[in-house]
């Protein structure tokens, strides 16, 4: 049996940058074991499989696999899969914005697809309501796992905290780009720290950026998911936005910002984040988006 697939680069406007994603637009009765085997063979941070939805609101149901396991939600798979399905004509497009609903493991979430001249552009997803874990008090285990002196973490003057808008990630602030470049993660040790916190990934960021229009520079490590480093992580961009809002880093009058990621991997990415807040300034709605570029189309023999 041969299964069609498409590979796209997400959170970029040019090929061979951003975060690559394999999309199987028709899962054709594959078993869970076959889906996992295909994801392992593709060896990308995620591979998605599109099925008929069980929720009548949804345009489709998407299952997401890393090389190691199935996960209930992820950012760049949501954006990239919606783009592929829009280009394939799987639902009607209306200018300037087409809203669809995408069924994933955490529920059915809305996505807005920007459309110009009948062509899909940026895809923006609405993530779940943010939730916040306890602040990490002992800096030594995470510092050792990242190959840093604990004093470097202390210089950031911001807390290390697990945050979720669908998937929980440990948000780790650094003071500057120099310390970001000095990261030498011990993935086994980092996996232990993340498991102890119930987090999927470690999203390390600094407010010092390379691009003048970016607000934060980030790197992502998810060893438990089989992803040593990820070039663009939408599921962590939302939690970072909520974190920056709660800790007073993002000005109240600022509603959106850009995260640059993947630069150290040679796959520069740009993730757009929008924050809506209540009267007290607490984040209520998180939207994350970006553009997608098609790269490869082919078949997988199963």
Stretch-by-stretch model annotation:
Residues 1-74, 79-302:
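Active-site proximal loop and beta-alpha junction motif in alpha/beta enzyme cores
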